[in-house]
């Protein structure tokens, strides 16, 4: 008998089949660089910067930009942003630069040029006979990179928000050390013609390169990052949420994971902490791995670690955090079970304040306080004969140990208590819920629960 087959009848005919499903052809790829080669892209022939500036600025004013020309110009303009490396810079074994070296964004990556000439049409003609200043180049580079940030703003009813962001970014590139080179609202008008540019690999690569450079190097034009900052930890919402969670509850990653009482966390935790990655290394290629093309399918996204993501944001909802209430539920990752665990953890880390004296008039007052606290602890640890001292953690209402929390969940049959439900309903009902958000899920799931 084949253990993988099932047997049944169809119109009195015996049928034996082996059920199979479509395999996931898009495997998660980790960004670790193993060949010691810098991330690279291939672009057309390097342009004359004056010609390129004139052409790109004309295209921006006409709301008609060629992405290949824009990428070629952005890569060529990197030479204008020379800075000094503050420390030895090494990532995944690649020596990017040494302390004191003069570097540009191009130092971080390998840009291969072909003989293909760009269009450089200069449509609309700009009356520019002199060479553009570095400030003018910096303003144009900054405005072009803002198109990346604007194209990452997606969702319903984002029109006004996007316009306001565009206006604020435009204002940055009108004031020193930058200089005004376009009329007001040009950026938003241009964006409408380039709404999906964040999906263009070369444009995304260059945005990430500029961001990685300006995040490390103290530079006059560092404000260019306003358009590229969204490339940092892109497609890492699962890992970023977990990092924020442990900071919020004031635990180490190891301590926090002990509270994750569900078998589906195992694969996700293993995926999130794969050895050999530079998740905790400052200024690593890891931070910009998505934009630099080092991973096609991120193992750190909300979908890749959906149970972890759901749990963290249910705890956040319990704590009344707007970001968690607005986040999108990963429907395929046990949201009902995660909401139960989130309620208990929310109660443990939010429902009870941790208050204690930390500041004193002098050393004697501090010493007296510590001695008094030590006496209290000794008295609390004494066995009163009613509960085995070895089991106190399981029954003490004040403890936050994983064992105690797990026991309380089991003693309540793996269901939320009335207090948990009332808290969930309270925070979600007073919030304008977005479609498929945690606020909407909690409202629909628990608003009619009478517990």
From Swiss-Prot:
Post-translational modifications: Phosphorylated by host.
Gene3D superfamilies, sorted: Nucleoprotein (1.10.3610.10), Rhabdovirus nucleocapsid protein like domain (1.10.3570.10)
Effect of residue 107 to M: In strain: Isolate Human/South Africa/Rv6
Keyword field contains Ribonucleoprotein: yes
Record note on what altering residue 127 to E does: In strain: Isolate 86132AS and Isolate 94286
Principal cellular location given in the protein's record: virion
Phosphoserine modified-residue sites: 389
Cell compartments where the protein resides: Virion; Host cytoplasm
Keywords for this protein: Capsid protein, Helical capsid protein, Host cytoplasm, Phosphoprotein, Ribonucleoprotein, RNA-binding, Superantigen, Viral nucleoprotein, Virion
Matching Pfam families: Rhabdo_ncap
GO cellular component: helical viral capsid; host cell cytoplasm; ribonucleoprotein complex; viral nucleocapsid
Superkingdom as given in the UniProt entry: Viruses
GO terms for MF: RNA binding
Protein biosynthesis keyword on record: no
Function: Encapsidates the genome, protecting it from nucleases. If expressed without protein P it binds non-specifically RNA and therefore can bind it's own mRNA. Interaction with protein P abolishes any non-specific RNA binding, and prevents phosphorylation. The soluble N-P complex encapsidates specifically the genomic RNA, with protein N protecting the genome like a pearl necklace. The encapsidated genomic RNA is termed the nucleocapsid (NC) and serves as template for viral transcription and replication. Protein N binds protein P in the NC through a different interaction, and can be phosphorylated.
Subunit structure: Homomultimerizes to form the nucleocapsid. Binds to viral genomic RNA.
Family indicated by similarity: Belongs to the lyssavirus nucleocapsid protein family.
The protein's name: Nucleoprotein
Organism whose genome encodes this protein: Duvenhage virus
Gene: N
């Amino acid at each position: 008998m084949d253990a993988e087959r099932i047997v049944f009848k169809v119109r009195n005919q015996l049928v034996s089949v082996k059920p199979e499903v479509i395999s996931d052809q898009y495997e998660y790829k980790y960004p670790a660089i193993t060949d010691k080669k810098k991330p690279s892209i291939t672009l057309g022939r390097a342009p004359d910067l004056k010609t390129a500036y004139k052409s790109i600025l004309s295209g921006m004013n006409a709301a008609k930009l060629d992405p290949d020309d824009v990428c070629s110009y952005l890569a060529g303009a990197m030479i204008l942003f020379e800075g000094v490396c503050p420390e030895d810079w090494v990532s995944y074994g690649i020596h990017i630069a040494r302390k004191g070296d003069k570097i540009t964004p191009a130092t971080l990556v390998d840009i291969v040029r072909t003989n293909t000439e760009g269009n450089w049409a200069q449509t609309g003609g700009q009356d520019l006979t002199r060479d553009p200043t570095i400030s003018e180049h910096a303003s144009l580079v900054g405005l072009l990179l803002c198109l990346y940030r604007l194209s990452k703003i997606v969702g319903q009813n984002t029109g006004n928000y996007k316009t306001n962001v565009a206006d604020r970014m435009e204002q940055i590139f009108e004031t020193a050390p930058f200089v005004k080179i376009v009329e007001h609202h040009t950026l938003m008008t241009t964006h409408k013609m380039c709404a999906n540019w964040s999906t263009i690999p070369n444009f995304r690569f260059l945005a990430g390169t500029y961001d990685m450079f300006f995040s490390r190097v103290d530079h006059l034009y560092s404000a260019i990052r306003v358009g590229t900052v969204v490339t940092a930890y892109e497609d890492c919402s699962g890992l970023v949420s977990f990092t924020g969670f442990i900071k919020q509850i004031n635990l180490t990653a190891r301590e926090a994971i002990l509270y994750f009482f569900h078998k589906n966390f195992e694969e996700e935790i293993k995926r999130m902490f794969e050895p050999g990655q530079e998740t905790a290394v400052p200024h690593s290629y890891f931070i910009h791995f998505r934009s630099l093309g080092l991973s096609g399918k991120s193992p750190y996204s909300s979908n890749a670690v959906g149970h972890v993501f759901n749990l963290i944001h249910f705890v956040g909802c319990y704590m009344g955090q707007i970001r968690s209430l607005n986040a999108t539920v990963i429907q395929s990752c046990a949201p009902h079970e995660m909401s139960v665990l989130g309620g208990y953890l929310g109660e443990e880390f939010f429902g009870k304040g941790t208050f204690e004296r930390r500041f004193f008039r002098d050393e004697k007052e501090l010493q007296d306080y510590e001695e008094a606290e030590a006496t209290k602890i000794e008295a609390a640890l004494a066995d009163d004969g009613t509960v085995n001292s070895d089991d106190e953690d399981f029954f003490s209402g004040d403890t936050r140990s994983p064992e105690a929390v797990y026991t309380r969940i089991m003693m309540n049959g793996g269901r939320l208590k009335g207090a948990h439900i009332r808290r969930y309903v309270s925070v979600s009902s007073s919030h304008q819920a977005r479609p498929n958000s945690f606020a909407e899920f909690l409202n629909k799931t628990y608003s009619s629960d009478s517990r």
